[in-house]
């Protein structure tokens, strides 16, 4: 079993780190009371071996060394990784001013600046013993996510679900697309009377479009575009990438091209690649 503990000053990005862990398959609990760590792991053992908890100043301040005592009681086969997130006082003041959230120590009737400084003093013993200390002062949420992911996986690459979706413009454009390509300029099988009843998934249409230099060039260029930029899309903290291909009716050209792109991206890909043909009401899911 692996236990990841995320601590740090309020406003430094603990919730961002916890969301990354959740995306990686961890069972996450925010601000778990420290004496319940052992109970939580015992209940999850066998059903979920990846667990992450966040610990804030209210737990640390009130219970002192309870965290270390609780960790010492865990089974020997529990791998523990700890993070401490911090930012300088000026950045934390700015973040709190922008969000207008209450600081956890504000109940002590002290100013925000005093609460931030007090929290730093209370958490200092924890900051000295963690495995990974991350200063988030100059990081945005994507950069912080990348750092956490890289520490845990050794890589910032993230598995994506890539959806290729065909559609017809005359039926409306899809609203969920990240990228959209208009293929209405390509040769249209609709004007070949014998091909009109078929779709882009049928062999006669595939043979017709496969003979068209413009179609092949377009597919190659789209494939090359996403192969070039995929590493950067992986680092963009996204889980889904939807690429929409549109023709007039969503029956021939867009269907064929979306299908061909899905097949090409499935070859040797670590990502889940799906093809969906909206106007045909057909989905093809594969890894």
Curated annotation (Swiss-Prot):
GO molecular function, one term: GTP binding
Ribosomal protein recorded as keyword: no
Residues annotated as binding ATP: 8-15
Keywords recorded for this protein, A-Z: ATP-binding, GTP-binding, Nucleotide-binding
Lineage top rank: taxon: Bacteria
Positions bound to GTP: 56-59
Pfam families in the record: PapZ_C (PF22740), RapZ-like_N (PF03668)
UniProt entry tagged with the keyword ATP-binding: yes
Function recorded in the entry: Displays ATPase and GTPase activities.
Family of the protein in this entry: Belongs to the RapZ-like family.
Record protein name field: Nucleotide-binding protein Sfri_3380
